[in-house]
Amino acid sequence: GVVNEAIEKAKTADAFVFGTPVHYASASGNMTSFMDRLAYAGGKYLAYKPAAICASARRAGTTTTLDQLVKYPEFFHMPLVSGSYWPMVHGSKPEQVLEDAEGCAVMRELGRNMAWLLKCIELGKANGITHPENPRRPMTNFIR
């Protein structure tokens, strides 16, 4: 299915952009299921690769959606690509989103910043700098 195809692509991908429409102030059910399955089955292929997230809404709910999406890159040591504002656009239809000048500008910033970060990573690799090897962290429960 879609997730298995994504896992295969993730093996050779340099970076990721995860975006979703906003449904009831959260990521769409499809995106949530996709991300949960991708993280569980293919998380090791996400590790240390840059990620950008973005959300599109008619009106509101984008910040809670971004908060939901950011959890995945944070869990897998993925450098998070940012811009000068929260990565969101507004509109019910593609042509309406294009009228969101500020949101579209932030999306272009994400693209430029992603390209810059990928160049920095490649330059680092060429000079013997690799990502840290983090030891396995202890797993604890709140109730003992």
What are these regions (language model features)?
Residues 2-5, 79-144:
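Glycine-rich phosphate/pyrophosphate-binding loop and the adjoining helix
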